[in-house]
Amino acid sequence: MSVSAFNRRWAAVILEALTRHGVRHVCIAPGSRSTPLTLAAAENPAFIHHTHFDERGLGHLALGLAKVSQQPVAVIVTSGTAVANLYPALIEAGLTGEKLILLTADRPPELIDCGANQAIRQAGMFASHPSQTLSLPRPTQDIPARWLVSTIDNALAMLHAGALHINCPFAEPLYGDMNDTGLVWQQRLGDWWQDEKPWLREARRLASDKQRDWFFWRQKRGVVVAGRMSAEEGKKVAQWAQTLGWPLIGDVLSQTGQPLPCADLWLGNAKAVTELQQAQIVVQLGSSLTGKRLLQWQATCEPEEYWVIDNIEGRLDPAHHRGRRLVAKIADWLEMHPAEKRKPWCVEIPRLAELAWQRVVAQRDTFGEAQLAHRIRDYLPEQGQLFVGNSLVVRLIDALSQLPAGYPVYSNRGASGIDGLLSTAAGVQRASAKSTLAIVGDLSALYDLNALALLRQVSAPFVLIVVNNNGGQIFSLLPTPQSKRERFYLMPQNVHFDHAAAMFNLRYHRPENWEELESALAGAWRTPATTVIELVVNDTDGAQTLQQLLAQVSHL
């Protein structure tokens, strides 16, 4: 019997089973123990293959692919700490709902806890963060192929959102020519190999029922809070709220067009909060809210009912309101709960939103971080997409900009870390093949710098704007100790990104005014290549501008 040949047949069943559940993208890191999985993926024509030398970046690349494709994405890595590097992406997927299938090669049981090289305790290493876990046995013909394929099918049928970790031990030898070993074992699956359906099909219904009293609540004074959702859902939510006459507070990731812009500014005004207190019901569609003032209002508002609708299961209301948690796709829920045409009941909030917007517009000519956030909609590529980083930049865009309704916006706002942002943006671009604008801070770019390797070959123009404010300036918004702030919080690195771009043969610009930025962008959108644009700004100007605007709007 050839161990290497049977390893490959075992792996081929696993990979083929994944295709029956919509997996098309497979992300592969180099490794020896993962050879059976890698070769099975490489030989399966149903897959689009992506490779990267860094497993942490690979996991985030898969995350970006899953965000856009809305399908599960497989990741193949070798044993040892390679597996541990998938942890950040796995955690993010668990919080934002993207489906990742993590195929982690492992040493066989007899090599664990005995001093063998590159052998760690992988089974269960991700604790409660995967939505599903599956620890497979060592490949053996004593276990029928139908057990293996039905086990994979069952795990994927149970995967509503988040990650499935499949740990796959393989014994040596890992290399060798294919022979007839295990061929009969494999052929017992019959015409399944020519079919396109899972071996085991399980129906799982998660959608909430229609709320029978909706006809009553839609006649009340309501507020719509829009969190993370798709572009198509964002447009529908905006129209739904407008018909109801309810104010819509749209997050930067809502893609609703934010009809009441600068919510993070006007929610700091007591008049707005007083008017919102009249709401009898709040309907929150989508999770992962960004704005600090929005979260503060959400934590203190006390409507008669607070409904949260999202496709992800679990509790998504950190303020623990009395109300309803409804699991459903947002578009489906809106269809089941149509709006009734009513006059808007809010008067003060639209006025405050307009005044706040005027205050922001008055400062747009200054070359700076806050002004870039406000102007970002002017720089979006036609029929393209936006990827927004974390920390200060996403808060500035949320507070100061008004993105077009239905324009695709992506971000990692689950755990909201700054790790893997460039890799995620690369996955977003690869899955869509659209022109992409990504904007991150300097520390975020440094954190994921080797992801520039993923941006060397792109299918459409990709612009990466690095806002270099020399450190983690979000801490300037927090009451961190002044004497300790620079060394222990901001951590300025005093670097520029021209050499990093050159290392990966990427185009690079460092504009010093809006005209130079617009010229660089105009050239970038004409070529299917990556352009790095570094905006060097005064360290604390972005945070200070936001604080000044908050103070101004609070006194309107």
From Swiss-Prot:
Keywords: Magnesium, Manganese, Menaquinone biosynthesis, Metal-binding, Thiamine pyrophosphate, Transferase. Binds 1 thiamine pyrophosphate per subunit. GO terms for molecular function: 2-succinyl-5-enolpyruvyl-6-hydroxy-3-cyclohexene-1-carboxylic-acid synthase activity; magnesium ion binding; manganese ion binding; thiamine pyrophosphate binding. It comes from the Bacteria. Pfam families: TPP_enzyme_C, TPP_enzyme_M_2, TPP_enzyme_N. InterPro entries: MenaQ_synth_MenD, MenD_middle, THDP-binding, Thiamin_PyroP_enz_TPP-bd_dom, TPP_enzyme_TPP-bd. It catalyses: isochorismate + 2-oxoglutarate + H(+) = 5-enolpyruvoyl-6-hydroxy-2-succinyl-cyclohex-3-ene-1-carboxylate + CO2. Its EC number is 2.2.1.9. GO terms for biological process: menaquinone biosynthetic process. CDD domains: TPP_PYR_MenD, TPP_SHCHC_synthase. Coiled coil: none annotated. Pathway: Quinol/quinone metabolism; 1,4-dihydroxy-2-naphthoate biosynthesis; 1,4-dihydroxy-2-naphthoate from chorismate: step 2/7; Quinol/quinone metabolism; menaquinone biosynthesis. Its cofactor is Mg(2+); Mn(2+); thiamine diphosphate. It is an enzyme of class 2 (transferase). Belongs to the TPP enzyme family. MenD subfamily. Homodimer. Catalyzes the thiamine diphosphate-dependent decarboxylation of 2-oxoglutarate and the subsequent addition of the resulting succinic semialdehyde-thiamine pyrophosphate anion to isochorismate to yield 2-succinyl-5-enolpyruvyl-6-hydroxy-3-cyclohexene-1-carboxylate (SEPHCHC). This is 2-succinyl-5-enolpyruvyl-6-hydroxy-3-cyclohexene-1-carboxylate synthase. It comes from Salmonella dublin (strain CT_02021853).
